[in-house]
Swiss-Prot record:
Keyword Flavoprotein part of the UniProt annotation: no
Similarity-based family: Belongs to the CheD family.
Catalyzed reactions per annotation: L-glutaminyl-[protein] + H2O = L-glutamyl-[protein] + NH4(+)
Name of the protein this chain belongs to: Probable chemoreceptor glutamine deamidase CheD
PANTHER family listed in its UniProt record: CHEMORECEPTOR GLUTAMINE DEAMIDASE CHED-RELATED
CDD domains in the cross-refs: CheD
Function in brief: Probably deamidates glutamine residues to glutamate on methyl-accepting chemotaxis receptors (MCPs), playing an important role in chemotaxis.
Stored Gene3D superfamilies: 3.30.1330.200
Any one GO molecular-function label of the UniProt entry: protein-glutamine glutaminase activity
């Protein structure tokens, strides 16, 4: 029997167990996966922006800065459990063409920086970090920690 697959949408966090597969497609957004092998749980978030412009509580994954605490809470993990977690980060591509000299805020780059900073702050070990480059990324995670990160073909 094939595993049940769930697509994680922009600003969403999904938690899986029992062989389920989580997947998403990313551009400048960043995908953050947490794997908790001992509990046989894993989570995937599809984050749109690094930080809110003003303090705005978000219960999902719109902002990288607020996502990790939500994921831990939904997985049932506490700060005492973070040493058992593994993180996989992908996406954060530079999806806009143009003169890079005029782009002061490249959202994909900022999303990746924020993801790394927030995971380090929570002392969660990053086992894979795959920046998107200048193309989209497909990310897939299964419970045994098996994951795939695939670059999508560039379109003209």
């Amino acid at each position: 029997m094939l595993p049940v697959e769930h697509h994680v949408r922009i600003g969403q966090i999904l938690i899986a167990e029992n062989g389920e597969v989580l997947k998403t497609v990313l551009g400048s957004c960043v995908g953050i996966a947490l794997v908790w092998r001992r509990q046989n749980k894993w989570a995937l978030a599809h984050c749109l922006l690094p930080y809110p412009e003003t303090f705005k509580e978000d219960k999902e994954a719109r902002y990288v800065s607020q996502t990790i605490p939500r994921m831990l809470e939904r997985m049932g993990a506490t700060m005492a459990d973070v040493s058992e977690l593994e993180a996989i980060v992908a996406g954060g591509g530079r999806m806009m063409d143009g003169d890079k000299n005029y782009i002061k805020f490249v959202v994909g780059d900022e999303n990746l920086k924020a993801a790394k900073a927030v995971l380090e702050k929570h002392r969660i070990r990053i086992v894979a970090f795959e920046p998107g480059g200048e193309q989209g990324t497909k990310m897939r995670i299964a419970g045994d920690g098996d994951y795939s990160i695939e670059k999508l073909p560039k379109t003209a």
